[in-house]
Amino acid sequence: MSKLPGEDTLLEVNIDDIRVSPFQPRRIFFEEDLKELILSIKAVGLIHPPVVREIRNGDKVLYYELIAGERRWRALQSAGYKTIPVVLKQVLADDLAAEATLIENIQRVNLNPLEMAEAFRRLIVVFGLTQDKVAKKVGKKRSTVANYLRLFSLSNEIQEKINSGELTLGHAKVILSLEDESLRQILSEKIISSKLAVREAEIEAKRLLKGKEDASKKEASLQKTSCLVSYQERLATTFGYPVTVKPQGKRICVSFFVEGEEALESLEKALTAGSFEVTV
């Protein structure tokens, strides 16, 4: 059967002659998922064969590099299949093959959030695409691409929980709403231990944030009170009279307590003459 130049070809190849593309974004494959896929393939056949390209040395084919379908290939390989049907892409340049691998997997494969983020990052870093161009190529909103890329600002520990499936993308977005790293860690642990839904995680995030704000206000109040007490003690030492220093709105009220007009007159002279020094 003849084919046109550049036309894709369906052929059967040795399963061990296939290699994974270095640009494959997916890194985690769960054994249970592969077993389910094998059962499906045995029941209805391989409906969508993996897509590959030839890697050659002159006229000799060294191996076939996967562009899409690694999960299907791994499933059949683990099931002991010796050959596999594939769709051969004709003469695809390295850069185009790499870009096609990333885009194909983003569009068709159930990547976890961090694998998706890594695919977006590679399109940006390796191929110099903007977030807008990436969004157009993969059929997503620019804000979606940006949200995925924000996952890299999370701690390694939280990223591992996303990779393992303990935290979803929705959970990650809630965690990212907290700027404080310690609060992020507390929230992530709470989500996992209490099996919180995203909405419940949002409520918990607000509670944690309010608690931190209340604690900050209390700390500021304590610091202010400590400062005023210090002034109060120094003023009492300087003038020799009992003193209170209290906040009144944005102002500070300083009250001296003196006994008799003579003491009051003495205090007045000291204040108006400016002949005093408050030791700091």
Curated annotation (Swiss-Prot):
The keyword Zinc does not apply. One of its GO terms (biological process) is chromosome segregation. Gene3D superfamilies: 1.10.10.2830, 3.90.1530.30. It comes from the Bacteria. The keyword Isomerase does not apply. Signal peptide: none annotated. GO terms for molecular function: DNA binding. One of its GO terms (cellular component) is chromosome. Keywords: Chromosome partition, DNA-binding. Belongs to the ParB family. Involved in chromosome partition. Localize to both poles of the predivisional cell following completion of DNA replication. Binds to the DNA origin of replication. PANTHER family: CHROMOSOME-PARTITIONING PROTEIN PARB-RELATED. This is Probable chromosome-partitioning protein ParB. It comes from Chlamydia muridarum (strain MoPn / Nigg). The gene is parB.
